[in-house]
């Protein structure tokens, strides 16, 4: 009986995710330039899509604390093409102590603003990690 309930709960969790709703939220709240709150904007979008997780203080923590993996994302090598809902987490460095986080809308990278590419730092570029849902 308990196994049945656990399976039912996992089924409900998996099927309650709406990536289109997450992206719609992200697109509708994006600014033209950075506000400095990339992780909060991407986290808000994930919540709008039905994801449940503990918010982190910094973007890099969504990778290092296993938050993205805990909600069904897996780390991947840089793909030849991106899929809607892919996430990048850029490591922190001395110039950017919180790192950076963004989501692929299907046509562009968006965090708290609409980006030109997945790379947001002009110099001293730390490693970028790629995550895909499912």
Region roles according to the model:
Residues 39, 49, 58-60, 71, ...:
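Intrinsically disordered, low-complexity segments enriched in small/polar residues
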Residues 6, 18, 86-88:
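Alpha-helical structural motif
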Residues 4-13:
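Sec-dependent N-terminal signal peptides
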Residues 12-59, 98:
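N-terminal capping segments
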Residues 17-29, 74, 84, 122-134:
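Non-catalytic ligand/cofactor/substrate-binding and regulatory segments of enzyme domains
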Residues 54-123:
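...with weaker cross-activation on analogous glycine-rich loops/strands in unrelated enzymes
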């Amino acid at each position: 009986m308990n196994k049945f309930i656990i399976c039912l709960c996992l089924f409900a969790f998996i099927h309650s995710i709406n990536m289109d709703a997450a992206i719609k939220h992200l697109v509708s709240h994006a600014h033209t330039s950075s506000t400095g709150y990339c992780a909060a904007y991407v986290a808000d979008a994930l919540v709008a899509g039905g994801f449940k997780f503990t918010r982190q203080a910094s973007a890099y923590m969504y990778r290092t604390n296993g938050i993205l993996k805990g909600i069904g994302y897996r780390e991947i090598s840089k793909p030849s093409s991106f899929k809607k809902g892919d996430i990048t987490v850029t490591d922190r460095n001395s110039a950017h102590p919180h790192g950076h986080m963004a989501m692929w809308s299907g046509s562009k990278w968006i965090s708290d603003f609409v980006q030109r590419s997945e790379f947001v730092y002009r110099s001293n570029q730390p490693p970028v990690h790629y995550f895909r849902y499912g």
